[in-house]
């Protein structure tokens, strides 16, 4: 079975790294994620990752609590750096070669984000982990995923969440909520479906970059998507 995609951008939330913990990084959870990523890398698909920081600090929450929003967002970017290093370390233990590139310069620790270098590393079979979001406050890591996916020529953004797709309502609160198999960007924006923020949706729509929303907790889901199987929800133009 041939791969449906040559190059993908995987968006991981910081919360996904917590597992069942209330805070931080659950080692067993990150190792399971890396095992799923390893399967995709072995298939020959080029994989880039944008990682959030909500398991450590959320800029939006900091702003809401009275902190200067820009300062809170920069703190959130530093949280993504910690997650990126943890993910790179777990990949190294699994035999996967990975590079971290940061939108904020931290030269003693990771490379700065340089687009041609990122593309070259993907072509050479390395996983590239993009840290620090877009490097600008007021932009989410979902928007960073849309931006980096567009920049490196990904064919799809794979949004890993705790639910197996986009629903008409929150399935945890509304038992009658139904899952969409496919939905357009305009429908998702007009219905205010809180899967990605409107800026990320609009950027992907304008770049004709589809998003597939799937559950990170479903074993083998990432591999099935790369092989072209119908998993989760496809958001398209």
From Swiss-Prot:
Q: Name one GO molecular function term.
A: ATP binding
Where on this chain does ATP bind? 11-14, 54, 58, 161, 167, 170
InterPro entries with a match to the protein in the record: AceGlu_kinase-like_sf, Asp/Glu/Uridylate_kinase, Uridylate_kinase, Uridylate_kinase_bac
Q: Which GO terms describe its biological process?
A: 'de novo' CTP biosynthetic process; UDP biosynthetic process
Q: Which UniProt keywords apply?
A: ATP-binding, Cytoplasm, Kinase, Nucleotide-binding, Pyrimidine biosynthesis, Transferase
Query: What's this protein's name?
Result: Uridylate kinase
NCBIfam families, per the entry: pyrH_bact
């Amino acid at each position: 079975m041939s791969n449906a995609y040559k190059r993908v951008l995987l968006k991981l939330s910081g919360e996904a790294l917590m597992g069942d913990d209330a805070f931080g990084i659950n080692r067993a959870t990150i190792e399971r994620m890396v095992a799923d990523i390893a399967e995709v890398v072995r298939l020959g698909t080029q994989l880039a990752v944008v990682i959030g920081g909500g398991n450590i600090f959320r800029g939006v929450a900091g702003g809401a609590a009275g902190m200067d929003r820009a300062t809170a967002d920069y703190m959130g970017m530093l949280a993504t750096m910690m997650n990126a290093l943890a993910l790179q370390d777990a990949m190294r233990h699994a035999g996967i070669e990975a590079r971290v590139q940061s939108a904020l310069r931290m030269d003693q620790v990771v490379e700065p984000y340089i687009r041609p270098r990122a593309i070259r590393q993907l072509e050479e079979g390395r996983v590239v982990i993009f840290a620090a979001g877009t490097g600008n406050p007021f932009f989410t890591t979902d928007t960073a995923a849309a931006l980096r996916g567009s920049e490196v020529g990904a064919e799809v953004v794979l949004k890993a969440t705790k639910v197996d797709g986009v629903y008409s309502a929150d399935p945890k609160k509304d038992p009658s909520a139904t899952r969409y198999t496919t939905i357009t960007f305009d429908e998702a924006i007009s219905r205010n479906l809180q899967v990605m923020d409107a800026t990320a949706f609009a950027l992907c729509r304008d770049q004709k970059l589809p998003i597939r929303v799937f559950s990170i907790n479903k074993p083998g889901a990432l591999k099935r998507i790369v092989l072209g199987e119908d998993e989760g929800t496809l958001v398209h133009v």
